[in-house]
């Protein structure tokens, strides 16, 4: 198909009209609750160290060369929004374009829309309740179920993810056609079993919030003070889709630096380029970010459920194949 006859939008106009109404409703939800809508940069001097995120970059060509540098397209507005929290913004939300240099398919587009919000002085379960409120309002769905990662893993895999031997995880992964090596990384095994065995079984009739992921998968979340084996992190699933990922946010700059350094060590082991650590973000944590919980929710996947669409292309104006 040539560019000349491939000009039509990916989604029907009727779906785009419904999408606009839903986004307006989301904005109203947050403004009525006293959150400030913010805008942060799409381009940044720093990428992300996360091993599992592939980023887009571009070159800033300043007129005289001194300011020329590589800039990274945002995979999430998280670091900038936390800098705003540290500056005293109070509770904030943002609906923004984000970019991940990964697959394009029924559930993925390299450019997509993210809803992200942060609540100072909210604990993890209070934010889970607010995500649930939003989903009920937008999707007219039943209240969410809330279960621990340990519980759902044991329920569907038959192993305790926090205490199982690595050999047991390898055996379970091989039963599900994952060609696990004898020295396979424990987190790789857990992530495979969760995504391939657990996720297809949960959130079918109503949303489910899975909380207390293993502390080795904490990312930017705090480790639970009650159980050091788990992180204060949660994810929402509904109708076969991962919708949201939230944290009781880590505010310790030293610990966050340590995690970034571990990310880069893992990148080296996997023969991936290391990423420069975002010193501005760490400086904001050092200055004092308030205790807060935050969550990122995929708007396009939310639209897929709201509009009863099986493909992400049906809810965005122009997918990557005809952008």
From Swiss-Prot:
Pfam families attached to this UniProt entry: tRNA-synt_2
Keyword Mitochondrion: no
GO annotation, biological process: lysyl-tRNA aminoacylation
Protein keywords: ATP-binding, Ligase, Nucleotide-binding
EC identifiers of the protein: 6.3.2.-
UniProt binding sites for ATP: 100-102, 109, 242-243, 298
Catalytic reaction(s) noted: D-beta-lysine + L-lysyl-[protein] + ATP = N(6)-((3R)-3,6-diaminohexanoyl)-L-lysyl-[protein] + AMP + diphosphate + H(+)
GO CC entries: cytosol
Residues reported to bind substrate: 76-78, 118, 249
GO MF annotations, alphabetized: acid-ammonia (or amide) ligase activity; ATP binding; lysine-tRNA ligase activity; tRNA binding
Similarity comment: Belongs to the class-II aminoacyl-tRNA synthetase family. EpmA subfamily.
Function: With EpmB is involved in the beta-lysylation step of the post-translational modification of translation elongation factor P (EF-P). Catalyzes the ATP-dependent activation of (R)-beta-lysine produced by EpmB, forming a lysyl-adenylate, from which the beta-lysyl moiety is then transferred to the epsilon-amino group of a conserved specific lysine residue in EF-P.
PANTHER family in alphabetical order: ELONGATION FACTOR P--(R)-BETA-LYSINE LIGASE (PTHR42918:SF6), LYSYL-TRNA SYNTHETASE (PTHR42918)
HAMAP family, alphabetized: EF_P_modif_A
Assembly and interaction partners: Homodimer.
Protein name, UniProt field: Elongation factor P--(R)-beta-lysine ligase
Protein source organism: Haemophilus influenzae (strain PittGG)
């Amino acid at each position: 198909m040539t560019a000349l006859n491939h000009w039509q939008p990916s989604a029907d106009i009727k779906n785009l009209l419904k999408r606009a109404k839903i986004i307006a409703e989301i904005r109203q939800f947050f403004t009525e609750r006293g959150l400030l809508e913010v805008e942060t940069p799409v381009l940044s001097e720093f990428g992300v160290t996360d091993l599992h995120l592939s980023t887009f970059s571009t070159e800033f060509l300043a007129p005289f060369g001194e300011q020329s540098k590589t800039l990274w397209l945002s995979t999430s507005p998280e670091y900038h929004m936390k800098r705003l929290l540290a500056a005293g913004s109070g509770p904030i939300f943002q609906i923004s374009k984000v970019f991940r240099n990964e697959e394009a398919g029924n559930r993925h587009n390299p450019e997509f829309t993210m809803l992200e919000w942060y609540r100072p002085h909210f604990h993890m379960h209070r934010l889970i309740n607010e995500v649930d409120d939003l989903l009920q309002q937008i999707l007219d769905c039943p209240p969410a179920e809330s279960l621990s990662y340990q519980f759902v893993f044991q329920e569907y895999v038959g192993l305790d993810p926090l205490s199982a031997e690595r050999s047991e995880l390898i055996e379970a992964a091989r039963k599900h056609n994952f060609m696990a090596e004898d020295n396979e990384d424990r987190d790789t095994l857990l992530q495979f079993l969760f995504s391939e065995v657990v996720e297809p079984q949960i959130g079918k009739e109503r949303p489910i919030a899975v909380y207390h992921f293993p502390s080795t998968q904490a990312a930017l979340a705090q480790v639970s003070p009650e159980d050091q084996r788990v992180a204060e992190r949660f994810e929402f699933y509904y109708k076969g889709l991962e919708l949201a990922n939230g944290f009781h946010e880590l505010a310790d700059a030293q610990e966050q630096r340590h995690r970034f350094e571990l990310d880069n060590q893992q990148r080296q082991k996997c023969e991936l380029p290391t990423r420069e650590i975002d010193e501005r973000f760490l400086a904001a944590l050092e200055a004092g970010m308030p205790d807060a919980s935050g969550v990122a929710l995929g708007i396009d996947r939310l639209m897929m459920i709201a509009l009863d669409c099986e493909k992400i292309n049906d809810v965005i104006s122009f997918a990557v194949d005809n952008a």
